[in-house]
């Protein structure tokens, strides 16, 4: 019966992937307000109300009022976003059970039908899991303390409400379900601390102990796992697995020293993603940037690009970020009004971003890329056409063979792990249908400026570029001889606080033969963008 009612309630409403774009989370704020209305209507219709149900109604009212007072920025905070999703998944199920006891299935069906007609999006279990995983990703990338993060403290600053013991437990359980015992151990420890100060506790101690004990065992802390399991058996004597687990751990420790204090907890982080430069990547995301080599330090500079007739009247500001390979930042090259048009055009088209499988050539979703994107044709709106022409002005590269403008909105902890923009030789059928060659260069427009996080980092080069609204980052993916430049492997760091909107243009080889010809010597690369050296004419 419960399963039938759940299907009735959420059919057509539960939308996975909401966590992959902050824009969707902002739209979801209205759904929480809808929950309050549902509960209030049910109370009036039945003329009776259980105390627990009324408590949930008051909590929803209070939380929604706070969220509305903050506005759309409410869900740009990862803790707030997680709690919002949790309230609309786990806690709503509790509300559903209370209604079920009152035989409210008919009432719920009417509400569900209304929601379907109004197209209100509700999160699903995948969204809750994705939100929890995002918190863990942010914790690792930015070296956040588990207790601080659970208390809404980031970088020593209180930025959100704190998590309850149950909230914290759910984050740990999400890690457990992914066999991530490193994070499960930390979050279950904090859950124990939380419930000590809760009256009544939001979750029972024995529920936490079982997950914590097994995670301790998996991380090599067998004696501690045994100690906690004995405690579990004592406070929950009817637990179906406790006594058996005690014997299992005792057998495992047979013949070993069981006397004395428990050894320190061992909790080594295990990497499952195969990213060998993980430490360097995360350090760059935190702004731990190595010093510039002395030979380049005095050469990095800004200049005015005016090597085209139009640019003589309206020169473009260029900041050289790095030589060999060259990377520059074009300053103020997209206007706020243009950004708003692009976001408005892209929002209805946003779909979860995909990556190309190097073996099959198929596009697929991946946990290492959390965002939603949309593609905008040049003839869709005059603004898109104008931006495309401007790209040609400041890159000097022919746009006839560039891809459509891709717009991306990063979700909760949104990121894109280290990758190449160009296709490597072993990749199957990459860009074959385009018949325009490889991606010679990338233009990345920053259309918003997150409060924290969201940098573009080049791991092997030790370069980190933090988003600056209205600017565009540019780099060449290929050497002048057409070979892929492996040094351009880069990543989009997780967004810690705020919203990240970007748009990018991938420019292809075909049509650039005379604009960027192969040099006489392989090692000779560009020192600036444009046909002529800008320095001689700079004021």
UniProtKB/Swiss-Prot annotation:
It is an enzyme of class 1 (oxidoreductase). Residues 1-16 form the signal peptide. It is found in: Endoplasmic reticulum lumen. Coiled coil: none annotated. Glycans are attached at residue 110. 2-oxoglutarate binds at residue 500. The keyword Kinase does not apply. PANTHER family: PROLYL 4-HYDROXYLASE ALPHA SUBUNIT (PTHR10869), PROLYL 4-HYDROXYLASE SUBUNIT ALPHA-2 (PTHR10869:SF156). Heterotetramer of two alpha chains and two beta chains. Exist either as a phy-2(2)/pdi-2(2) tetramer or as a phy-1/phy-2/pdi-2(2) tetramer. This is Prolyl 4-hydroxylase subunit alpha-2. It comes from Caenorhabditis elegans. The gene is phy-2.
